[in-house]
Amino acid sequence: MITGEALTNTLVDELNDLGLPNMAATLDSLYRSERFLKLDHLSLIAELIEPEYQDKVSKRVNNRLRHAKLIGCPQSLDDCVDSQSREYLPAGITSVLSSLAFVLDGLNICILGPSDSGKTHLAKAIGVAACKEYKVEYHHCESFLEDMVALKNVSYEKYERKLKLLERLDLLILDDFLLHTITDEREVKILFMILEKRCEAQKSTIVCSQREPKSWASMILNDEVSANAITKRATKHYTVVINAQNNQ
């Protein structure tokens, strides 16, 4: 007759073969503890599943962070509060954004403030938090548009595939938005197309800029219509202003 220890060892081996090492280790540890016989069936199942589940969740979040180019970022929304060095306006806006309801609702966020005011910190903190539930990408706007133009020139098929992925992406973050003047008509068209498609699909986009939206049109040369359309979509919902006290 097979003993409890022999059966446990067999189950541990089978769980490892199934690619469930955390569950296997937990079963082995529980069986050798005094608590094993005191656990009811559901409690035992719960204790076996929890470590494996948490490991899978952690790996999924890390994969999302890596894809978003946010892996290893220390930024946290807990740090994005009013202080002596900076103020977030309107009042209470960081608490609203921390809920991430805007991602679910497909709303856009425009983060404004001078250089080193904390725009990137806030955007990355939102991105890191969003990766727990959503697919995110973080890009510097200028290099992002250059890469999209280059991809289109190399392979239109891959470019189209990337556009479709961007259209379905839960949250797109474009940092340093219009930091320099866009003179390439192809970049203007791509930026407009992405914002337009994402608005139609009700997907959230965050842009961070040192410049007031009223000056954006002058940063997009030779296409006033597209410039106005881009501004309208990027500032459609929430606008966050960061006042950095040390910059005033």
Residue ranges of predicted features:
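Charged, compositionally biased N-terminal leader segments and the immediate start
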Residues: 1-18, 24
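Interdomain "pre-motor" coupling segment immediately N-terminal to P-loop NTPase/helicase cores
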Residues: 20-72
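N-terminal pre-Walker A segment at the start of P-loop NTPase domains
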Residues: 74-100
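Short glycine-rich substrate-engagement loop in P-loop NTPases that contacts/grips substrate
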Residues: 86-94, 131, 137-167
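Conserved alpha-helical scaffold flanking the Walker A/P-loop in AAA+ ATPase domains
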Residues: 95-101, 150-172, 189-197, 229-230
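Walker A/P-loop nucleotide-binding motif
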Residues: 105-122
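P-loop NTPase Walker A phosphate-binding motif
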Residues: 121-132
